[in-house]
Amino acid sequence: MIFRPSLLILSLLAGHALLAQYNGPESVEYDPVGDRYLVSNTGSGAIKVRDQSGTVTDLVTVSPAPYGLEIIGDTVFACSGGGIKGYSITDGTLVFNHSVGGTFLNGITTDGTFLYTTDFSAGRIYKVDVAQDSHTTLVASTGGSPNGIVWDPVGERLVVVFWGSNAAIRAYDRNTGAATTLVAGTGLTNIDGVTIDCLGNFLVASWSPDRITRYDPTFTQPAVDLGVTGLNNPADIDFDTVNGRVCIPNSGNNTVTFFEVNCTTGIPEDLRDKTRSIVPNPARDLVRIEPPLAANTPYVVMDVNGRLVGSGTLSPNALLDVRTLETGTYTVVLTGTGTRLRLVKE
């Protein structure tokens, strides 16, 4: 059963950083282990780190300048010219460097095993095997300028957004490269980024208008403007499933916007219970909620991609068994109150 509660736009966070902090921000990638954000900067050629307090520091300088970012494990992979480079998210050490012979790699995503990257200028999509340090051309010609790309684990497809007037949205099979048109003409010009929110909806960032637009998972319902203000050429967006935020780099004014949405019951943010925590954390086997719950409480567990991996009801003082979860970061949502708790599984 897929958990699909109602969605409520809560607030526009004060996510605009000082202009000096960013220089051509292109891509934001949420790091769930560090609970922070990695931001590629095409102007300075740097990948920067923004923590939850708003402090911005440098992780590493990349040449050619970094565009799309994607994290697998402890490595952040960056589109850099005609290749992909991987850096330790701990200290910025270069750990992977593979050329695909591309022209201008722009967007990047992963299905957990392979990387998939768009070549904006050549109109191609490449599939990169990190373990084997090899690649193949998945799509030799998309017939346009592919930009943002995201792996859809529910539909088992690559969803790609395109540059240009009345831009299209297409899906591609990760094994054969076979294409399916999801939206032939969006009415949007220059779609830069795409991500998936906590409800399985697709969010796309366009330059004209400057907007974040939501599509339902089937792409059959009318598109919805999220109403995010202050955007200026929004680029390669991401969704922070732990904190429920759309992460938006504004390449036009050197800022990053965080727009928070309610992924659970529609309870206003200021009425949510923020006093509870998971103990112990990180954990390997059994955890408990502190302070104890007052009554039987339904819950769901979501992974960093927003996928439902567990659900049930917790009674007061009950222990939650997390032994079957794979190593990684998860969000435990108490659906009755909207409380979101971060869990790190060792």
How does the language model describe each region?
Residues 1-24:
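Bacterial Sec-dependent N-terminal signal peptides
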Residues 21, 54-61, 93-99, 134-140, ...:
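A short beta-strand motif characteristic of beta-propeller blades
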Residues 22-34, 42, 62-74, 78-81, ...:
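Beta-rich, blade/repeat-based domains predominating
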Residues 45-48, 84-85, 123-125, 166-169, ...:
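Structural signal for beta-propeller blades
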Residues 50-55, 88-93, 129-133, 173-177, ...:
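Short loop/turn segments that connect beta-strands within beta-propeller blades
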Residues 261-279, 285, 307:
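Residue-level detector of functionally pivotal "anchor" positions at catalytic/ligand-binding pockets or at interdomain
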Residues 301-309, 330:
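Short, glycine-anchored, charge-dense loop/turn motifs used at functional sites
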Residues 311, 327-346:
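C-terminal tail/sorting-segment detector
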